[in-house]
Amino acid sequence: MTLTHDPKEPTPDSEEYKLFEPPSNKTLGGKNFDELENWDDDSKFYKDMVEYHDKIIGRIIAKLEDLNLREDTLIIYAGDNGTTRGIVSMMGDKEVIGGKGLTSDTGTHVPLICNWPGTIPESTIKDDLIDASDFLPTMTEAAKISLDQEYIVDGKSFFPQITGQDGNSRDWIYFYFDPNSPRVLRPVVEFVRDKEWKLYSDDKLSLIHI
């Protein structure tokens, strides 16, 4: 796992790396939430972190190729949540505003890239709904492993879709978010959504057209 995550710090490829005391060092030995997240970081290093993140992925792929395992390996690249608020990235000519901790698309709609030479057709793009519970059945299907019937799995495999088959895509997703942080005094948020609508379980039962 590699992260472009707070604290935003120089990477080994950054000029400032040798002269920099990582702000996360301030948290060593911390015993409570405030001590563990007591850092000051600098957004200027976000670009360096993304580039180093990309470099590490490249090294993994190169090693798989050296071991002649590339065509036997499914690589799944996925984000866990939106980018830190305050960070604005570009995707083509479109601005992508960080929305980590929010239940809008900027906080919950994240990248998912699946790559497997010889198995997943190149340039395949899908707009299917996928959530984290779908990874287990997808990976077991890719590995040709059957889950015992005693296991109750909420997820749906999206392996057929990424390999050019029809599959059985989701009609909806259920989302539950509990900030669970003394610094973020916000209520639990629940919603269900499909590709067009999002329904929140708030007092107003807010229905939003996406």
Indicate where each model-derived feature is located.
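Segments of small-molecule ligand-sensing domains
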Residues: 162, 179-181
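A broad structural signal for alpha-helix termini and local helix breaks/kinks
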Residues: 143, 162-163
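Basic phosphate/pyrophosphate-binding loop/patch that engages nucleotide-derived ligands
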Residues: 166-169
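Active-site-proximal cap/lid insertion segments
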Residues: 1-136, 140-153, 189, 197-202
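Short beta-strand-initiation
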Residues: 185-187, 194
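Charged (Asp/Glu and Lys/Arg) segments that form or flank catalytic channels of large polymer-
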Residues: 158
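WW-domain-binding short linear motifs
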Residues: 171-175
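Conserved small/polar residues in nucleotide/adenosyl-binding loops
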Residues: 208-210
